[in-house]
Amino acid sequence: MDKLTLTRFNDLIYQVLTDQGEHVGNLKLINGVWKFKAIGYAQHGEVIPGGGPLTHRHNMTFVALDEAEIGARLSMG
């Protein structure tokens, strides 16, 4: 997996992008916890919630918005 970066969408949502700019998910602040929501795209651009290359990490939680920790945990195995 490429290096992952976070891009602020608003106060409650950050997009998770690869270093190639591919959108692979969002981090959403839910009840004080950051929850990863995987995103995939079908052949014609349709969004596949919970899909994509990080589908196995869907709903992973984080206590802080730490880009290094988030990237490391999402990229594991």
Protein language model regions, located:
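Intrinsically disordered, low-complexity proline/glycine-rich segments
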Residues: 3, 24-25, 32, 39
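Generic beta-strand structural signal
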Residues: 8-9, 27-29
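Conserved beta-hairpin
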Residues: 14-18
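A generic structural signal for beta-strand entry/edge sites
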Residues: 11-13, 31-35
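Mixed-charge, Lys/Arg-enriched low-complexity segments
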Residues: 1-10, 37-77
